[in-house]
Amino acid sequence: MSTQVMNETKERMQKAISAYQRELATVRAGRANPSLLDKVAVEYYGAQTPLNQIASITVPEARMLVITPYDKTALGDIEKAIQKADLGVTPSNDGNIIRITIPPLTEERRKELAKLVKKYSEDAKVAVRNIRRDANDDLKKLEKNGEMTEDELRSSTEDVQKLTDEYVSKIDEITKDKEKEIMEV
């Protein structure tokens, strides 16, 4: 029974790490990356539509994104949505495609982004710790219902703690890599 709790816990912690990595992908480092535009939603035929569903996003150069809409009439709406998203970039529309040149990051902006990464890191760690708490509660219920002994509970709780430590150190590692990427000039 405790293996089921452990498997669920591991799965939930892995999902927390994946969510953290998706969140980090939207933080702009010095290079162009299509995931920078993941949170951009375009008003398209009256509905908020994710940009990557109505246009292809390519990276022809290290500091440039090119957005080619599937429907040319959406060009203006896409441009407005990018400006409204406040990403610190300026789109240029040539009538067929939109080019976004990624400016090099200033030292001040790098520090802001590093702070943001730290905040996301803390949020991910809190999520992992909450999962640990839930797992420990589940294990205590099993012990209370007589489905496991006190020794098994202690052992399982230690396993959950080891798992938590492992995932928290993974988060720290990912954070360190992202901060290094941001601080790279």
Curated annotation (Swiss-Prot):
One of its GO terms (biological process) is translational termination. InterPro entries: Ribosome_recyc_fac, Ribosome_recyc_fac_dom, RRF_sf. GO terms for cellular component: cytoplasm. One of its GO terms (molecular function) is ribosomal large subunit binding. The keyword Protein biosynthesis applies. It is found in: Cytoplasm. The keyword Protein biosynthesis applies. PANTHER family: MITOCHONDRIAL RIBOSOME RECYCLING FACTOR PSEUDO 1, RIBOSOME RECYCLING FACTOR. Belongs to the RRF family. NCBIfam families: frr. Responsible for the release of ribosomes from messenger RNA at the termination of protein biosynthesis. May increase the efficiency of translation by recycling ribosomes from one round of translation to another. This is Ribosome-recycling factor. The gene is frr.
